[in-house]
């Protein structure tokens, strides 16, 4: 289950719990997406399905998220979308790892690790695996290519598994 961590821990914990009950085998915590990236193709095609209420059912069906709403999404879709858009932007720190461990029994994978020191710190904190990723360059399209960071991340990770996913030709 890939978690885009909301500001409210209660919402995150509810999503994680539901993922466990649904049979997911790992928690992938996305670190490389605080805001939506600059995507020229999406802008040209007005491709933002979330702004029309699509692909948000995990949130709209979540009892804790619904508790943030004054009316159910079926009655006030725009307010539900606005609430969804406003719950992100909280940057996780290493101090949040114990909370994540408490929130799940699943293995934890940190997605967005692109520096050897971060891989080493993740291993030291008992993280189960890391994704060397810049979200395909779609979120941080001005950053260093993850492929260039991969050897250092692998070295820093030691025996911890390292996964890789990112744009190779273009993030846009």
Predicted regions and their residues:
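Active-site entrance/lid segments in N-terminal catalytic domains of soluble metabolic enzymes
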Residues: 1-124, 136-139, 148-151
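A beta-strand-loop signature enriched in Asp, Gly, Thr, and Trp
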Residues: 119-172
């Amino acid at each position: 289950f890939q978690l885009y961590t909301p500001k409210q821990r209660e919402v995150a914990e509810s999503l994680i719990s539901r993922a466990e009950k649904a049979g997911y085998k790992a928690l992938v915590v996305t670190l490389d997406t605080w805001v939506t990236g600059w995507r020229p193709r999406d802008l040209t095609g007005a491709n933002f399905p979330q702004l029309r209420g699509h692909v948000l059912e995990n949130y709209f069906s979540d009892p804790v998220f619904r508790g943030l709403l004054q009316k159910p999404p079926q009655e006030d879709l725009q307010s539900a979308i606005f609430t969804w858009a406003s719950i992100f932007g909280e940057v996780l720190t290493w101090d949040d790892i114990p909370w994540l461990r408490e929130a799940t029994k699943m293995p934890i994978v940190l997605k967005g690790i692109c520096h050897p020191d971060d891989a080493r710190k993740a291993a030291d904190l008992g993280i189960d695996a890391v994704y060397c990723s810049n979200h395909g360059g779609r979120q941080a399209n001005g950053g260093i290519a993850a492929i260039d960071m991969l050897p250092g991340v692998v070295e820093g990770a030691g025996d911890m598994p390292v996964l890789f996913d990112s744009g190779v030709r273009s993030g846009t």
